[in-house]
């Protein structure tokens, strides 16, 4: 997993301050760790968006104006329900030997058999919660969909544990992650056959 440096600056918590901050292209955020005081900061919206919308997860070195650097990861993001802009972010501090739970994006590889037969690949879970040490965290959880047929799904329990040594996927084992759906045309044809009256039946 790549480590990214992200500049942050301390901010004051005042009435309407967050809204004014957003108008300048900055996003209000907090930095916290168990047993430590929470730090209110601001971060550049453009730089933050690149991380939030990335297809990979990252460890983030938060760089303060005084040169102090704190290692962290994005724990939570709040979006505006209308514009979908990032309006607030939580950064959780982390040490090298600390076990954390982190949302890791899902990526697929291979050409699904079901897609070659006319189906449509659908990723149901775009990220999974992974538990482990920061240095062991993958950039993404890669799932091989080559053998996936139409109407079939790959569940959390079917993701090989050997692919992520020292890590544990915390999502429910029965959670479907990716599936192949029948095309609309094929689904309609199947329904037509199922609804047809057998010849001679009356």
Curated annotation (Swiss-Prot):
Entry superkingdom = Bacteria
* Gene Ontology biological-process annotations: translation
Q: Supply one GO CC term from the record.
A: cytosolic large ribosomal subunit
The keyword Ribonucleoprotein is assigned to this record: yes
Name the SUPFAM superfamilies on file: Ribosomal protein L25-like (SSF50715)
Matches recorded under Pfam families: Ribosomal_L25p (PF01386), Ribosomal_TL5_C (PF14693)
Q: Which UniProt keywords apply?
A: Ribonucleoprotein, Ribosomal protein, RNA-binding, rRNA-binding
One GO MF annotation is: 5S rRNA binding
Similarity remark: Belongs to the bacterial ribosomal protein bL25 family. CTC subfamily.
The record's function comment reads:
This is one of the proteins that binds to the 5S RNA in the ribosome where it forms part of the central protuberance.
Subunit structure, as described in the record: Part of the 50S ribosomal subunit; part of the 5S rRNA/L5/L18/L25 subcomplex. Contacts the 5S rRNA. Binds to the 5S rRNA independently of L5 and L18.
What name does this protein carry? Large ribosomal subunit protein bL25
**Species this protein is from:** Chlorobium luteolum (strain DSM 273 / BCRC 81028 / 2530) (Pelodictyon luteolum)
Tell me the organism's taxonomic lineage: Bacteria, Pseudomonadati, Chlorobiota, Chlorobiia, Chlorobiales
The gene name reads rplY
